[in-house]
Amino acid sequence: MVAVEDGYQQLENKLARTPVIGDVHPLLPLALSSSVRIVKCGDDVLSELDDMHAAPQSPTLILQPDSRLAARFPTVSLKSHPPIDAINRNMHCHLEYAREQLLTTYGVTAALTEDVTERRYDIVVLMLVDGLSYGDVIDWIDTVIPCFVDGPSVTYRLADDQKTVLPTVGFPSIVGSPTVFARLHDMGYKNALGYTYWAPDSNVISDFLFKQIPTHRVANFEAILAELRSFTFKQSTYIQIMREGLDGLAHSKREMSRAEIDGAIIAIRQDVERVMQVLSKQKRRVCLYLVADHGILWKTEHDWKVLDVAGSRPRYSTARPDEAACARTVRYERSGQVYYSYTYPYLGSRIKADDSGVHGGLSYQESIVPFAKFEVR
């Protein structure tokens, strides 16, 4: 970590003196100081140079190599994961970069469909994990992609009538409209299966996420594996699985040790491997995509600053906080509802005694989730 910190700080120091062409980790721009401007290509910088005959006035990171600028500005390669504390400190200043240059939850369906169109797998699995951060799985597989939750980092929200699912918040924003299944169905994936652990009182959201998919509520993951073993897939098939992640643990126990959290993360990985092992016996080309709705900030692992906003949840509010607290939020408007998500490490209200973790705000842990891909060829 010392080397990473040094490389990050050296880049910050260099940016204070000159624009830099950066071949960097995709999350590094989120860690840079608020004064740093991030541009995709050198065209804007060139136009400034033409106008001013001098270097740009603000620190500038140029993301794409540019032969026109290479002789004038240094190129820095920094592929290591940036310091998490720097991301949490600065990411609210670089939301434009996150929305335009990172995969977002709104882009998952298109990215998945595009990949399937190119690869033409026989069996496609989408595992939706309720509560898992990019940082939790970073060492699982080299191809895991950081995905930005562009909105309140929650599982779903209902309209005031408590019957209508808001389509641009949480899992609904990931499944998309048209849904993953609707898009794959048009590509020939006529056979579909769905599995969820959610209880019947979650039927509204389950019906939304599993629309037109024959879906089974299961008590545990073993039931999914047992059913998959019983099938012989002779046609192109789409399988959608809702897997409990860390969300349930965050809201069901007063305290969670790091060992318990790590054990739950390992169990998710093992379930991915078990699904792949079962489906590999089909002797077909299989791909499993994994994505989460949000990550978790654990209660005992952070030095919180409590703002005591009336009517607020710990990490977000649907009512506008007072001016002082509002300065510590990012405002989203999704499906006609306004959300004020707190930046790190602020809480609108204290974490419930029975909760060991929270989500809903803007942070590396909550707002950067994994989009991972596992193949059987």
Predicted regions and their residues:
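Feature captures the catalytic ectodomains and active-site-proximal regions of enzymes
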Residues: 1-377
